[in-house]
Amino acid sequence: MTESIVNVSRQFFAEILLPILRRDFPAETAETAFGVFGYGSEVMGMDDAYSSDHHWGIRINAVMPDVLYQDRGRTMAQAVLPHMPESYHGYDVRAGFSGGTGLSITGLESYLKTTIGIDHAPASYADWLGAPEEDIIHIVNGELWLDETGRFTHVRQVLQGYYPEPVRLRRIAHWCRYFSGMGSYALKRAILRDNEYYATIVFSRAVRWAVQLAFMLERQYYPYDKWTYAFFRRLPRLYAPLAPLVDEAVRLATPWERKLELLNRMADVIDHFLVADGIIRPHPQFAEHPSSGYRLLEHAYAEILHDLPEDLRGLVPVWEQVHWEANHSQFVAGLELEAWDGMLNLRAGE
């Protein structure tokens, strides 16, 4: 693709949409934040030739206070429609991202709640741990072009500052526990029992957790799975030592015993950085057990927990997109089935 849809959308907003909004809705515009943010590969800067087959086109995302949205949001979105050109820079505006205007407005508090589970910037351990990391990305990504009140800017800035250190450590501990206990240990048991079904599940999850741990050690949010590896390649410290292990491990031709060995070496790399960063203390080299395998990172899990505040130890991070899925289910339930099939590019065969 020769031109990013984000760049085109920014120009469209400045040249076409913003003058209309300032003229017809000056008070509402002053209360609204505009940009491109949220969901979609283009917001991550990862759009390519495949991205344009669904939910594609000029897009301006906007968030305003919920009360204002309920009163004026839908009116604004519909009122700009007659003033929109059919196309802009070769893009069909009326077939774009938001279905006819290029402008997608929602309530700020509702948007936050359906993305990270709270309607404000995180202010407590529970707030931080209740927000799925891959959905924090959908608040901080993209671009914000106008936010005169600074409400959304404030939320973005708090999240862009990354986790408070105790929260980061609690998350690292949780991932160490799962990589080791539900990953490498589980794979060892699956191999011993010749259970390839279970081996496939636990191996895939373990590789995912190892790469996500690399992001935590670098103090960077990981994105959703489709783009995790692309951003993994940008990590300044962990990519170089982990990538050869990950790349060999995920090859289908790599035997199960070798996959387990590679998981164990990933654990060594992560453990090295945990010690180097002062997260855990230096320790002796542990031996691999013939039936339990190499539960190295569960040593780190326990040590980190011991040093955490008591009120944080029992808080479990939310890592699935539970808040967004609740919203998505309501969205899909409100569509005609034919419309949903069209969005999925499902058409009757010949």
Predicted regions and their residues:
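N-terminal regions immediately upstream of nucleotidyltransferase
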Residues: 1-19
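A generic structural motif
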Residues: 64-69, 193-197
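Active-site nucleotide-donor binding segment shared across nucleotidyl transfer reactions
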Residues: 21-61, 65-67
